[in-house]
């Protein structure tokens, strides 16, 4: 999926994430040939960029002896923010399943950090994924959204978010 639009050199997102992972672990990458199978459609809102960033970091970790101790999942999540600033997509790619994620501001001007939890979901719930037939860049899709949200709509949506998380765990 998307092979015609994916870079095949050092600018490839998976390669950049792998190199960043090696740097974070202070490790030298071994020689390797990378072949990717892109099963997540690009430009459809399913998190292909987040998956590429997380996948690259996890691959670098797996190629370094003791990498699991040198690069924790939390560090993977936060390094991946350098490539994809959507912790919801990143946490889904890293942990799988249902996630609630958020950005935490340091208040000091340092980059935001991300955190995530994986609430228990009732086992009878089955996810449904709808894939649009045509792609659209995330920046363009978000560009058509209003910069302001009505206060009552925001409050309503916030209350329903908590309700959704609760409801997904109930019989």
Labelled PLM ranges:
Residues 11-18, 53, 127, 138, ...:
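A general structural signal for well-ordered alpha-helical segments in protein cores
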Residues 8-12, 46-54, 155:
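Short, conserved micro-motifs enriched in small and acidic residues
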Residues 1-8, 38-47, 80-87, 147-152:
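A short glycine/serine-rich beta->alpha loop
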Residues 13-20, 55-63, 75, 79-82:
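Generic beta-strand or strand-like secondary-structure segments
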Residues 46-69, 94-99, 104:
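DPxDG-like acidic metal-binding loop motif
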Residues 1-44, 62-70, 106:
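ATP-binding N-lobe of GHMP and related small-molecule kinases
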Residues 69-171:
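ATP-dependent small-molecule kinase catalytic core of the GHMP/sugar-kinase superfamily
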Residues 23-24, 58-61, 152-158:
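Glycine-rich loops and low-complexity Gly/Arg-rich segments
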């Amino acid at each position: 999926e998307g092979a015609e639009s994916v870079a095949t050199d050092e600018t490839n997102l998976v390669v950049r994430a792998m190199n960043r992972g090696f740097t974070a672990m202070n490790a030298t990458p071994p020689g390797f040939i990378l072949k990717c199978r892109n099963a997540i459609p690009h430009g459809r809102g399913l998190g292909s960029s987040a998956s590429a960033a997380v996948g690259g970091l996890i691959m670098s970790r797996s190629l370094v002896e003791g990498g699991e101790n040198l690069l924790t999942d939390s560090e993977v999540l936060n390094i991946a923010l350098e490539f994809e600033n959507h912790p919801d997509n990143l946490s889904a790619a890293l942990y799988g399943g249902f996630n609630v994620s958020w950005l935490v501001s340091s208040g000091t001007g340092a980059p935001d950090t991300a955190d995530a939890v994986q609430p228990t979901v009732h086992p009878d719930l089955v996810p449904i994924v709808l894939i649009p037939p045509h792609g659209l860049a995330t920046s363009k899709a978000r560009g058509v959204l209003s910069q302001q949200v009505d206060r009552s709509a925001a409050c309503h949506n916030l209350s329903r978010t908590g309700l959704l998380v609760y409801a997904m765990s109930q019989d």
